[in-house]
Amino acid sequence: NAQHRKSANPILSGFHADPEILYSRQTKRYYIYPTSDGFPGWGGSYFKVFSSRNLKEWKEERVILDMKKDVSWANGNAWAPCIEEKEIDGKYKYFFYYSANSVTNKGKQIGVATANSPTGPFTDSGKPIITSSPVGQGQQIDVDVFTDPTSGKSYLYWGNGYMAGAELNNDMLSVKEETITVMTPKGGTLQTYAFREAPYVFFRKGVYYFLWSVDDTGSPNYHVAYGTGNSPLGPIQVAKEPIILIQSPKDEIYGPAHCSVLQVPDKKDSWFIVYHRINKEYLKHGPGWHREVCIDPVSYTHLRA
């Protein structure tokens, strides 16, 4: 369960959404990589990064990737990124995954850019790495990357209308096509746990946790549900009490979802969830693209341990 902290949120000024959080072993700082929000029709075309030493005060660093300047295969709708820090031959390298609108008019596709620093500069690989749906419908968006601490293997997850996962090749720039797995959690409703988008995966105490968002990003009812599994590619067992983050109108909190999760380094079992919510002033006017980033501690009291 996530514990809403009204006073501390939002943590970033302005409109941002779909936050990915990273703790860098190289710099000993925290970073958030969000969708740039506030544009009608989710029309943001660039990604920024924010940094912090303490998870409380955040500094805007820079634009790290601009679809119109830095990416040849895309022209806009820069959405929902994720990042992985890898130590390769004694040097740190950063793999930044994102979705964007393809210049070939084939809809949303997923790309990857690389850097030697959490703040870039990032260089795009030059082509999308996920271009089509394994189920023939839905969107190739909302990418997540996860490295399994038990094997060292890295995995990519994505999907809107479906959830897919695949093992990444060692270069982190492509997936092993034969491992692509449709993982969509079965069942549920918009009020409970029906999968919509935004998969997120992490590992704790021998268990793989799978989080996803339910309903629509412009709805106050947009919320987070979860399940668990015994392998990075499922199958996913939906939890008995699957909802872990949902609106609280009395606290003026609406549509809290599309999250990432952080285990605080050097602390035994301290975790935070970073997510966006709808800015309360825009509930009736473009709620889906007036979102703000928040952070709350996670309690495992009611979650499978």
Task: Please place each PLM-identified region on the residue numbering.
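Surface loop/turn signatures of beta-propeller and other carbohydrate-active proteins
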Residues: 3-25, 39-42, 56-87, 103, ...
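Hydrophobic core segments of beta-strands in well-ordered, beta-rich domains
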Residues: 20-41, 62-64, 79-105, 124-126, ...
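Structural motif
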Residues: 43-46, 105-111, 162-167, 219-226, ...
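Short, catalytically relevant binding-site loops at active-site mouths
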Residues: 163-164, 172, 187-190, 208-209, ...
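Acidic, small-residue rich beta-repeat scaffolds with periodic aromatic anchors
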Residues: 173, 180, 293-300
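Aromatic sugar-binding interfaces of carbohydrate-active proteins
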Residues: 225-296
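Conserved small/polar residues in nucleotide/adenosyl-binding loops
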Residues: 301-305
